[in-house]
């Protein structure tokens, strides 16, 4: 009688499984290991047991932008295929601070900061995910009880040499930049999350690949079936050059007003539009391919940019808001003043134009105001302001900065 261990059953790759795999692979950077994941999908289809899909996010900031939703969109697609989505809030790992992509130690957050940020984190994510089909977990559930003994045992499962394979650690080590011991623990703790959750698939950005692979290795050591990993690209910002970031000002916040969100999305280049369609839209890829063919046939790209902007605004607000945002955008494009602009009352006339723009909330600083004047981007009652030394007399007028910022100003002495 053979003493060889029995091999795992092989499940058939049906059309349903092929469709699920195609949906999973849309817009991804890497899916590792694809053959393993196809078998996981096939087993799920054959047995009716949903896969456990994990996404861990550290609440390092209270607000998210549409760049963060790229991976959330993928989670929603997998959710719609019937799988269990685990939205993991890294309240414990936030105390360490993720060193991924860093050239210096990241300052850890306080417990108070983490709890404050986490309050709004899932509420915003739920604008993309199906709230009723999402399992919310906190990694402090299993990380805190580990204690010193458990942490030492976990640390013994990975070597310093393996940790130093990370490019960011290697650069810091070779450059003589300090690396704290607690930073070595971060990928181990993130990997242990996958063990605790028995994850079948873990998602993350391309900068998370090393951490995701650690989870796969730890599952093997703990005798679990290894998770597959799926990395999503980092979304380019409105400039189409650098990744979307609040610090770079090239972002669209998901809590922004519908008109602002719509206007920003309409400002992207025609080339970048296709990237946003692939990563942010839920439209089928064959439909998007049809849009491209229509443009090649002479259709105006603006028509499809409108569809993209409306879809995204409707997702985070409503369809009615998306329609109103389009009307507002068209009105502004014709040189009109929106109906819903804020009214501001200021004192101190005659007031320097830079101060007026700042106090009206149209720019963050007087230097930004002067830059806009230099670029011809400031208007009072439709007339372009070119004099940076202008003193504005008392009165009532509409002030405009750029294409989308307006205020109805009443200036008194």
From Swiss-Prot:
Intracellular or extracellular location(s): Cytoplasm
Entry's EC annotation: 6.1.1.1
Residues the record lists as binding ATP: 246
Any GO BP: tyrosyl-tRNA aminoacylation
Main location: cytoplasm
Free-text function comment from the UniProt entry: Catalyzes the attachment of tyrosine to tRNA(Tyr) in a two-step reaction: tyrosine is first activated by ATP to form Tyr-AMP and then transferred to the acceptor end of tRNA(Tyr).
Name of the featured protein: Tyrosine--tRNA ligase
Organism for this UniProt entry: Burkholderia lata (strain ATCC 17760 / DSM 23089 / LMG 22485 / NCIMB 9086 / R18194 / 383)
């Amino acid at each position: 009688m053979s003493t060889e261990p029995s091999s795992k059953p092989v499940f058939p790759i049906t059309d349903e499984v092929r469709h699920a795999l195609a949906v999973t692979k849309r817009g991804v950077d890497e899916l590792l290991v694809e053959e393993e994941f196809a078998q996981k999908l096939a087993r799920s289809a054959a047995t009716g047991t949903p896969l456990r899909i994990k996404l861990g996010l550290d609440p390092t900031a209270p607000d998210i932008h549409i760049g963060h939703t790229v991976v959330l969109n993928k989670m929603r697609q997998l959710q719609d295929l019937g799988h269990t989505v685990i939205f993991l809030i890294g309240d414990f790992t936030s105390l360490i601070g993720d060193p991924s992509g860093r050239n210096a130690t990241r300052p850890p957050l306080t417990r108070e900061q983490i709890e404050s940020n986490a309050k709004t984190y899932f509420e915003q994510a739920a604008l993309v995910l199906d709230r009723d089909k999402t399992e919310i977990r906190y990694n402090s559930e299993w990380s805190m009880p580990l204690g010193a003994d458990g942490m030492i045992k976990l640390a013994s499962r990975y070597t310093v040499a393996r940790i130093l394979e990370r490019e960011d650690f290697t650069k810091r080590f070779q450059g003589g930049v300090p690396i704290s011991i607690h930073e070595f623990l971060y990928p181990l703790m993130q990997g242990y999350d996958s063990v605790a959750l028995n994850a079948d698939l873990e998602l993350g950005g391309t900068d998370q690949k090393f951490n995701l692979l650690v989870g796969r290795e730890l599952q093997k050591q703990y005798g679990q079936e290894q998770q597959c990993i799926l990395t999503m690209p980092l979304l380019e910002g409105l400039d189409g050059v650098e990744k979307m970031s609040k610090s770079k000002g090239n972002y669209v916040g998901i809590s922004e007003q519908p008109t602002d969100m719509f206007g920003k999305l309409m400002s992207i280049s025609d080339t970048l539009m296709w990237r946003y369609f692939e990563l942010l839209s839920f439209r089928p890829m064959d439909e998007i391919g049809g849009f491209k063919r229509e443009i090649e046939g002479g259709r105006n790209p603006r028509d499809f940019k409108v569809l993209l902007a409306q879809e995204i605004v409707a997702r985070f607000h409503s369809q009615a808001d998306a329609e109103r945002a389009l009307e507002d955008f068209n009105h502004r494009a014709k040189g009109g003043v929106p109906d819903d602009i804020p009214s501001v009352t200021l004192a101190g006339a005659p007031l320097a134009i830079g101060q007026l723009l700042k106090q009206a909330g149209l720019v963050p600083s007087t230097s930004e105001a002067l830059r806009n004047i230099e670029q011809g981007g400031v208007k009072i009652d439709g007339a372009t302001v070119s004099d940076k030394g202008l003193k504005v007399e008392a009165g009532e007028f509409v002030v405009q900065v750029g294409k989308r910022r307006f205020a109805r100003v009443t200036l008194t002495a």
